[in-house]
Amino acid sequence: MDETDKEVDDSIHSNILYYENRELELLKNAMNIEAKKRGERIAQNPIMKQIINVLEKFIRDKKLVCYGGTAINNILPESEQFYKRNLEIPDYDFFSSNAINDAKELADIYFRQGFSDVEAKAGVHYGTYKVFVNFFQIADITQLDSKLFSSLKKNALLKDGMLYSPPNFLRMAMYLELSRPGGDITRWEKVFKRLNILNRHYPLKATNCDPETFKHSLSARSYNKQFQNEKEKIQTIIKNIASKEKLVFIGGYANILYSRYLHNNERAYLEEIPDFDLLSNTPDKTAKAIKESLEKQDIRNITIETKAAIPDYLSTHFEVRVGSQPVAYVYKPLACHSYNSIKVKGKIFRVATIDTMMSFYLLFLYADRPYYNPRRTLCLCEYLFKIQQKNRLKQTGLLRRFSITCYGKQKTIEDIRNEKAKQYKRLKTKKKSKEYHRWFLRYNPELNPENKPFIVQSKTREDIINEAKLALEAKILTSKAVIEGIDDIQKIDKLKKKNIVPTPSPMSPIRSRSSFSRVKTNKLNNRKNISARLSMRTPKTRKNKQVENLLFVEDNFTPSNM
């Protein structure tokens, strides 16, 4: 092949790639347009509006606390909101101190008001319960430690009668996500944008953070003669253990290292912090190692106290004291947290990234523990935030952000499913126990005897049509239904040869009842098959028979012409 032929081939190849890329752009554009239309159809559906109104009233009446993307969205000015209510249904996540009962109560409310296909069930994550109405997931209710729930409720933002998690807690959740490179990093861009918007409208501000005030506060809090006399020796011993065991500093010494990026007057405050906060995969052993090493250096009156966990947020941790003075807090990481390594006087130290430190400190604000001083902790957060903002593009040393090196075990979906499988084997003979329901709740309000008077409900034809439209949209939005629809299309030829009418695909027009009369096979069996395919629930879940009949009556009733 000469050079001319090669140039021609390259040109042809370039043209092919150009047209393929243009076609891909057209495809994406069409998908976006259809997704927008579909979202608007669902959001504007009168039945869906009723469903959301019932949910919001429930959240208000029960004084539950919203969190997550919808919470961030709803506390922002309308011009900055990233969810448009006329185009998307709000995806409410909220905390409860009694999540399983609240999920069942919400399901009962929907059932008693005549909504179809209502169910409450356990989510993938233990302690989270989902409520479904009309084939749509409407709410995620998450169990929260009672003290933490009370603290969030006390500090919550009230808007339109609904409680939203305080901005610092919402901020904490986003810093936590950005500090876990072993987690779902595909969400990082979205989370980062939302964090920046929240920081603009709800700045991280603290009061009375002058170094002199805090110097006195620290001294009054825990003055100990032995500690003051042997402070340097104690700190050197702990630093040596941390370096040797490759632990991660998340406070105390980490703050001192970060203080080099502050002004001199601010730096003086951070240098006065007397204790260490460490991440260790074996915190009990680390606490004992610190105690033994201190005792070898003739430091006496050392105690270790076990501190209770905050489920899903903070592990059981250990406080090491010299007399009355805490010298170290050792935590087991619940995820894989990012850190950077630096060399100081010939020793390698692992220091948490600012994102990791912020995720811990902002949680401490609401932990309601006497050993966390909220005012001092908030000041630390403000200083760290300032450092990060002033050095946001520097990616060296301690300032490297979004580090891929992390410490701890990150749970995967597979880990969670394996844990649920183990729990099922353990509890499968105790299906009526409370523990089984906490893990595997599947609540159908129709089976609740108290709901029997509400089973018969009269509905207008308009309500029936709107429910049918929602049912169709739900089928299309479900990936399983789409896959089944594709399988149906591929099987059409084979089914025609056998003179069997295929089950309607959720992607194809639904035919009238008369078109089924010509089928030689048993009509009753076909109808059972279709009903089963339209159902997204267990056989015991109530179906709206009027909706199912309508799906046979309406000709050419497809999502595209709703």
Regions found by a protein language model. Give the residues of each.
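Compositionally biased low-complexity segments enriched in polar/charged residues
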Residues: 1, 63-71, 75-76, 85-88, ...
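Short, conserved charged micro-motifs
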Residues: 100-106, 284-289
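Conserved catalytic core of two-metal-ion nucleotidyltransferases
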Residues: 109-150, 293-338
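N-terminal regions immediately upstream of nucleotidyltransferase
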Residues: 1-50, 158-232, 470, 474-511, ...
